[in-house]
Every structure is written in structure tokens, then in C-alpha cells.
Amino acid sequence: MPKEQKEVRDLQEGNYVMIEDVPSKITSYSTSKPGKHGSAKARVEGTGVFDGQKRNFTQPVDAKVWVPIVNRKQGQVVSVSGDDMQVMDLETYETITMRIPEDLAPESDDEIEYLEFEGQRKVV
């Protein structure tokens, strides 16, 4: 499993964290001061990398959380058909079928960049 554990205090905006078992990119990170009877708390807000949903959690800053290792890979578009495209990974030469994002109009032989985590892929 490509995940590692980190303390909440080590997280930063722009990094990835598992929120509700979904890899998410941190959009907001804030901490509260320690109180008389408790430790400092951190509020982390993020957006799902693959589904785009907003999620958040609040935990003590010394709590451990899972951080996904999201791989950024290069690929070449082999063919385009409807809403899908076939992409060849430039490292392993494996052919993958992926959805075409709305803001992208790929053509054959275009090179693209995509994110991969535990079998999920998304064109960036």
C-alpha cells in the first residue's frame, strides 16, 4: 500500500492526506492554541484528488494520519474515442484507458501528465 504515516502538525497546504479513506489535496490548514485541559487542534480541509469533493477533519496536532504517495506519471495518447482515450505509460509502455477531462482536447501522439494512486488515475 503506497501510504505513510505523519503527524498532523507536519502537514502543509498543497500536500496530500487521506481524508475519509480518500486521497485529498490539502486546501486549508489551521491550528488552534492549546487550552487549559487539552492540546492544540488542527483543522484540515481538502479536495478529493479523483472525485473533487471537499472533505475536512479536526484532530490534535500530535495525532497520526495517513499520507498517500500519489505518483505523477507521463503518458502518450494512443487513440481517442468518445469520452475515453487510450494512454501508453512512457515508463512501462502499459496501455491504460482513461476518461478525458472536460478542459482537455487531446489528439493522438500528444504527451500528457497524470496522477496515479492504487489503480485510480486522473489526467492533470
UniProtKB/Swiss-Prot annotation:
GO terms of molecular function: ribosome binding; RNA binding; translation elongation factor activity; translation initiation factor activity
Q: Which SUPFAM superfamilies match?
A: Nucleic acid-binding proteins, Translation proteins SH3-like domain
Protein name per the record = Translation initiation factor 5A
Q: Does the keyword DNA-binding apply?
A: no
Which family is this protein grouped under?
Belongs to the eIF-5A family.
The UniProt entry, under Pfam families, shows:
IF5A-like_N
Cellular component, GO, one term: cytoplasm
Arranged from A to Z, the UniProt key words for this protein are: Cytoplasm, Hypusine, Initiation factor, Protein biosynthesis
Q: Which GO terms describe its biological process?
A: positive regulation of translational elongation; positive regulation of translational termination
Upper taxonomic classification of the species?
Archaea, Methanobacteriati, Methanobacteriota, Stenosarchaea group, Halobacteria
Q: Which PANTHER family match?
A: TRANSLATION INITIATION FACTOR 5A FAMILY MEMBER
Q: Looking at the record, which segments are called Disordered?
A: 27-53
